[in-house]
């Protein structure tokens, strides 16, 4: 049975990380850049690389089938170790994941990623949970989220990267400032 999965855009197929040949080609890409002197890598939505079974279960929006999947830690560990980038800076963008899972990805003893970043703090001004419909930010909630994530990551020996926005978000000055 064949299918075409595209979580973000119909022109961007999700790679089948269950296929060992795909994983080997991704390792070759990393080796290519490493040989040219790159000192680190940012992995986009890396926690979505392992998919669960979709068989006849259509409840919800489907995130539980493609977020933090059954082989994600195995695949990241393999990628990092087989390419020799264990000591490089590696940061993974995390979509729809939890503090506990971010700790797993970045805990130094697990030897997966050096740091992660997630978007929980950027939802404090979403109107009706919609990214492009904004309201005044809830600064108390923002402060609480930062505090909980920083203390939680520290306690779990993880490391999260702090940021205000990226290409997936409305401009920061439009949200938290005055143009």
Predicted regions and their residues:
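Active-site and adjacent substrate-binding regions of carbohydrate-active enzymes
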Residues: 1-179
């Amino acid at each position: 049975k064949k299918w075409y999965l595209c979580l973000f855009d119909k022109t961007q197929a999700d790679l089948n990380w269950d296929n060992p040949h795909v994983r080997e080609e991704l390792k070759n890409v990393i080796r290519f850049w490493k040989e040219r002197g790159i000192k680190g890598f940012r992995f986009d939505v890396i926690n979505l690389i392992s998919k669960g079974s979709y068989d006849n279960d259509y409840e919800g929006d489907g995130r539980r089938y493609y977020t933090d999947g059954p082989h994600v830690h195995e695949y990241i560990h393999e990628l990092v170790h087989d390419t020799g980038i264990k000591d490089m800076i590696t940061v993974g963008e995390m979509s729809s994941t939890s503090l506990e899972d971010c700790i797993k990805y970045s805990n130094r003893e697990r030897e997966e990623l050096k740091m992660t970043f997630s978007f929980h703090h950027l939802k404090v001004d979403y109107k009706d949970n919609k990214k492009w419909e904004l309201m005044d930010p809830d600064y108390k909630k923002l402060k609480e989220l930062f505090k909980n994530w920083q203390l939680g990551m520290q306690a779990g020996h993880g490391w999260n990267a702090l940021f205000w926005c990226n290409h997936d978000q409305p401009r920061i000055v439009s949200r938290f400032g005055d143009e």
